[in-house]
Amino acid sequence: MSEKQKMIEGKIYNPNDKTLVMDRIKAKNLCYAYNNLNPELTEEKKEIIKSLLGKTGDNFQIEPSFFCDYGYNVEIGENFYSNHNLVILDCTKVTFGKNTFIGPNCGFYTAEHPLDCQARNKGQEFAKPISVGDNVWFGGNVVVIGGVTIGNNVVIGAGSIVTKDIPDNSIAVGNPCRVIRKV
């Protein structure tokens, strides 16, 4: 099994594998091109994102700056909007449903490191997927950790750190993020 397959399947892998390093460089080059493109060139911007991400709807907008590790593990649904400074560490799948709205300075981090310092110091990593349902709004400065599923019709309040699943039809806030009421 290749290191890339291990990574995508959530197994311990070596992020310094030559193929993975080259994949990250390709993604960083596309992010650089996207982030430095004239804002008026909307069609060119869309083409870069479509070539970078694993799947997109037809209607999306990502404000620069945007950064990801690989891109091919990210899927965004129809009517996706992200404000400035979105970071997606997509060592495995990060899936967004339709009608997703993301405030500024948000991060979605699938990358995990062993708690054991000897394994961690060897450079080993693993990843856990993130799944976001339909009709979800993230306030600014939200962080979502790998292994989390966020249901449909959810609002995540600004500054929240999401470490556990959030059920459908919820408003959730805080660090750690917790449901405060149903909608």
Segments and roles (model prediction):
Residues K4-Q5, L52, K122, P129, ...:
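Short secondary-structure boundary/capping segments
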Residues G57, G133, P167:
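Short conserved AdoMet
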